[in-house]
Amino acid sequence: MKKKLMGLAFGGAFLAASLGVFGFVKAETTSEDITPNLNVVRSIEDKDQVNMYKAVIDEKGYQNITLNFDASKKDEVNNGWTLKVYDENKEELYQVSGIKAQFTSANFAFAKGKTVYISVESGIKSSMFMPKGVEYNLNFHTYADSDYETENNNKYIDANEIPTGGAVKGSLLNKDDEDYFVYQIPETGYTKVSFEILDFVPSKILGGWNLEIYDKNKSLVYKEAGITKDVTLPELPLAKGQKIYIRIHPKLAVSTFAPVEIEYKLKVNTVKSGKWEVENNGSFKKANKLSGTKYANILNSSDEDFFTFKAAKTGRYKLSIDTGDNVKNAYKVEGFVNNKSKKAVSKVTMSDKSYTFKAKRGQNVWVRIYGISGNSPIGNKYSLKYKFVKK
């Protein structure tokens, strides 16, 4: 959750992010130590006054801030308060201006032991419109939660680890926020990744999220763009020990379209299976052995699946591909017999098909399956098998 600088309206709160007012705490600014989960009662007496607080995260989980006041004083609040949050380096991460109602911030996910700075000041630098003398109650709440992301996880190197069969909750706090997670495959088979929207608020989901899967070399494996509802990704057929990175960020890095402050849950689970292809099988050299029925899918526009078997008898063989239901895009199916440069089969299909070819006993057979450029069946599960039909 890269909470780089943000302003968000709550009630009548003013969107300050667009004004470029973010920065750092001034070096001479002194801070008051506060204890998480205890109220601090203070007020602003001067238009230029800044009340700065310092808190240390006391447990792993998430945090938020409440700022409340006596409702009978609402007419004296005027343009309200501005609340800012800074990291341990005193770089501003979050800002909300024009707080004139009971306020609860977004959730943060700072690591245990980290220092956080919070400031409260007049929402507008004017003696006439400031909330002079109105006491506010400030509370920095911390909540224990072992399943919550931990800052800063906005780069590969800082990715949060997801345990086997585990889940993690997170959120994006601004248009530039990115969350990275890493998962190591515990068994050869297929891995399922699901994305659940915990706070389903259509007016805030807007353009939705992009969820991208990368391999250990940071090469794109699969991308789900514009997520606006719960979704489960296609099976990821990966080998034991392989590592994947999961990146979550706004589809559109524009304040008016980014799904900020909406909590999501990311779940990852691996099912052991010997019936699936094993990535990376994108070349003759890395072809998977074809024995019985193999399941596979095309995960991106450059993904190619290679399979191989050795002819046990001399005669005719039938290769069958089952593309499943409602396939809108096309597969290219190619077969090679003992010669990687000569095609014994070369067909395009959008439905279940069988192809026959001849092979002699002991000859190597390769099958290559990939999507047609611009019309690739990305994410669609298919199955492949062969059998000897006659001499």
Task: Go through each PLM region and give its residues.
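Bacterial Sec-dependent N-terminal signal peptides
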Residues: 1-8
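Sec-dependent signal peptide cleavage junction
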Residues: 18-32
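C-terminal edge strands of extracellular/lumenal beta-sandwich accessory domains
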Residues: 28-34, 51-53, 115-162, 179-181, ...
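Non-catalytic, beta-strand-enriched accessory regions in extracellular/secretory proteins
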Residues: 40-60, 103, 168-188, 231-233, ...
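Hydrophobic beta-strand segments within beta-rich accessory/binding domains
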Residues: 54-76, 116-120, 153, 181-204, ...
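Short, surface-exposed beta-strand/strand-loop-strand elements in extracellular ectodomains
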Residues: 77-90, 204-218, 328-340
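Surface-exposed loop/edge segments in extracytoplasmic proteins
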Residues: 89-96, 217-225, 339-348
